[in-house]
Structures are given as C-alpha cells and as structure tokens.
C-alpha cells in the first residue's frame, strides 16, 4: 500500500524536483547557516505556498536559528528515526519551538502566523532519516493535529513514523535522495491529502 501511494505521488506531483534540489543545496551548504537558510527557503516557499503567499518568513531569523542549533543539528544529521528514544524528546521540543518561531510569517496581514508544517519540512531536510514530514491532513489522519501542543504532537507523529519504518524498512525502496520517511510522506500525501488512493 505504501509503495502504491508513493507511485501515485510520483505520477501526480512534479514537485519532487524541488525536494531533490533542496536536498542537494542543504548537503552542499551544510555548516554555512546563510546558505542553508536559502536552501531551506527554496523548498519552504514552494511546498508551503499556501502559507507563504501571505508573506515570507524572515531569512535572518532562520539563519540565526540554524547557527544557534548547529551542534544539535549536526548530532541529528545522520541519525535514523529507529534510534528515536525518550531522551530525544526535550531536544526535539526545543528545536521545534525554535524553528516554529523562525519560520513564522514576518510581514503582511498574517504576520506572526506559525506553521508546524514548515517546521517538519525544514527539520526533515536537515536530518532526512530522522525527522518525519507531515501536513494538516496527514497530522489529523494520525490523530496528531497540532492546533494545541504542536511539538508534542510532532513527537507523537515521529513515534508513529518510527513504527512504520520498523515495518517497512527493506520492503519498500527509497531511491536517493529519498529516504524511507520521504516515501512514507508520499504515501500519506497521496492517501490523506490528495485522496489518490
């Protein structure tokens, strides 16, 4: 079923080029916060256009958040979600809160609007085998809607994603630069967001 969802995603969505480019840019500019902020911006401004059409986030705030959290991000960069444990929750909560603030709309009529979706997308690009992707409909489908306690709901969603990876690893291919978490997101997007399957 996950493979069918991923195939449906790839048949309908041409935006995977943005994921590939953003992944490449983050890899290429890793350790350089201004360039990393630009790399994340490529994906966020396109993938989360529903929010950022009302106003951009502050790239300087994102750059500062990256700089302040670089050692933590380095420690998570090559982690696998299967290593997720209770001891990670405080770190994830802290990162989530920092990125939630950095990625809020900086100007315009929705100034200050925050996006847990943008946070998950940014964190995933920074540690693609550790942080899961979601959107509003996907979060609701898994009982993790984030209108209250977004970081806590994201941790719950990561635990659910970890269980899915445990079941799927080695059974569902993830062609580079995709990860098994990206393939699961493609399935979730096809099933819950677009209802293609």
Which residue ranges define each predicted feature?
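An N-terminal alpha-helical hairpin/helix-loop-helix interaction module that forms a charged
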Residues: 1-110, 128-197
């Amino acid at each position: 079923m996950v493979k069918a969802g991923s195939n449906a995603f790839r048949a309908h969505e041409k935006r995977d080029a943005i994921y590939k480019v953003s992944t490449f840019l983050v890899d290429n500019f890793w350790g350089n916060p201004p360039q990393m902020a630009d790399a994340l911006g490529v994906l966020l401004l396109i993938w989360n256009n529903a929010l950022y059409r009302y106003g951009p986030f502050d790239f300087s705030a994102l750059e500062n958040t990256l700089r302040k959290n670089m050692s933590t991000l380095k420690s998570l960069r090559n982690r696998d979600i299967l290593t997720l444990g209770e001891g990670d929750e405080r770190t994830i909560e802290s990162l989530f809160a920092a990125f939630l603030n950095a990625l809020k709309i900086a100007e315009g009529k929705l100034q200050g609007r925050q996006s847990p979706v943008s946070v998950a997308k940014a964190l995933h690009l920074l540690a693609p085998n550790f942080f899961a992707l979601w959107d509003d409909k996907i979060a609701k489908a898994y009982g993790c809607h984030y209108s209250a306690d977004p970081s806590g709901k994201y941790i719950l969603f990561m635990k659910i994603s970890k269980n899915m990876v445990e079941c799927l690893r080695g059974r569902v291919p993830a062609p580079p630069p995709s990860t098994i978490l990206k393939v699961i997101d493609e399935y979730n997007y096809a099933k819950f967001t677009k209802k293609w399957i």
